[in-house]
């Protein structure tokens, strides 16, 4: 069976940049077909009309990715697919909607470290936006958060292939859960990855203060700039964690086989099995 995976993106979080590629990293899986629609940077309720385009694909499972899934726009987008298996991927503020998501039968993966950006005009230009997201992606990839997302979605795909009612994930991705998925062998690498995740989590608090609470530019500009510096340092720590594992030849890799099976290996020159 070929499982049809629909991805709807509203607004920007780090996970949205790569979520569909986490499922088919070499573009050779034969068990899934993927379509992606997006409203771009905007996420007002009227932008949820892009869901109609995805409905034409008739997906077997829908992934809705957005910042703050508690907002009206993302809510309208996921509710357009009520009755289908829907997985919401969002950031820490979406925890406000956790109970509602459970009640309505939606799956969710909420990633604490996928923090909001410092969206003040005096500070954020396209280059700064791209650099921030590059740092977020490195943190989420190297700590294990992306692997946790990938494996949770793959499990749903496997359930659908087996003709079972899929068990949708209900996960809040913490530092501990991320590094567990990261499968670090070296304790110092694990500690650096945890430090990276914790710092990245804190970025959101500072950017919220800089974007929504402080009104004086003399105060909010340094705040959002400092938050971005923190994410940069988090990315460096995440990179250092992976470098330690590389030096010991213990980087865990879990590529997909053509049939979608998740393989595994640690030694670089070993064959994944």
Swiss-Prot record:
Keywords assigned: One-carbon metabolism, Oxidoreductase
Keyword set includes Transferase: no
pH effect on activity, per entry: Optimum pH is about 5.5.
Pfam family for this entry, one: MTD
Keyword Oxidoreductase: yes
Temperature dependence: Optimum temperature is 70 degrees Celsius. Thermostable up to 90 degrees Celsius, however, only in the presence of salts.
Pathway named in the protein's UniProt entry: Metabolic intermediate metabolism; lactate oxidation
Transmembrane segments: none
GO MF annotations in UniProt: ferredoxin hydrogenase activity; methylenetetrahydromethanopterin dehydrogenase activity
GO biological process: lactate metabolic process; methanogenesis; one-carbon metabolic process
Matching Gene3D superfamilies: 6.10.140.120, F420-dependent methylenetetrahydromethanopterin dehydrogenase (MTD) (3.40.50.10830)
Protein EC: 1.5.98.1
Catalyses which reaction(s): 5,10-methylenetetrahydromethanopterin + oxidized coenzyme F420-(gamma-L-Glu)(n) + 2 H(+) = 5,10-methenyl-5,6,7,8-tetrahydromethanopterin + reduced coenzyme F420-(gamma-L-Glu)(n)
Family annotation (HAMAP family): MTD
Family, per entry: Belongs to the MTD family.
Its biological purpose: Catalyzes the oxidation of methylene-H(4)MPT to methenyl-H(4)MPT(+).
Protein's name according to its UniProt entry: F420-dependent methylenetetrahydromethanopterin dehydrogenase
Organism in which the protein naturally occurs: Archaeoglobus fulgidus (strain ATCC 49558 / DSM 4304 / JCM 9628 / NBRC 100126 / VC-16)
């Amino acid at each position: 069976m070929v499982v049809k995976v629909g991805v709807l993106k509203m607004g920007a979080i780090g996970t949205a940049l790569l979520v569909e590629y986490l499922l088919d990293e070499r573009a050779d899986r034969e068990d899934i077909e993927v379509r992606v629609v997006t409203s771009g940077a905007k996420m007002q309720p009227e932008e949820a009309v892009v869901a109609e385009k995805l409905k034409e694909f008739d997906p077997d499972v829908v992934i809705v990715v957005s910042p703050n899934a508690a907002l009206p726009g993302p809510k309208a987008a996921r509710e357009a697919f009520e009755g289908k298996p829907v997985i919401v991927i969002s950031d820490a503020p979406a925890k406000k909607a956790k109970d509602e998501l459970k009640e309505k039968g939606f799956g969710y993966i909420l990633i604490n470290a996928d923090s909001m950006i410092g969206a003040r005009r005096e500070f954020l230009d396209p280059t700064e936006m791209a650099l921030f997201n590059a740092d977020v992606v490195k943190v989420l990839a190297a700590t294990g958060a992306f692997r946790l997302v990938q494996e949770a979605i793959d499990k749903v795909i496997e359930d659908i292939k087996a003709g079972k009612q899929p068990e949708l994930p209900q996960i809040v991705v913490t530092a501990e859960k991320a590094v567990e998925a990261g499968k670090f062998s070296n304790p110092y690498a694990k500690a650096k990855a945890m430090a990276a995740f914790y710092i990245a989590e804190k970025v959101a608090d500072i950017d919220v203060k800089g974007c929504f609470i402080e009104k004086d530019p003399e105060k909010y500009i340094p705040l959002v700039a400092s938050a971005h510096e923190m994410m940069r340092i988090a990315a460096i720590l995440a990179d250092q964690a992976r470098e330690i594992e590389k030096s010991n030849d213990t980087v865990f890799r879990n590529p997909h086989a053509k049939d979608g099976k998740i393989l595994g290996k640690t030694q670089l020159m070993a064959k994944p099995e």
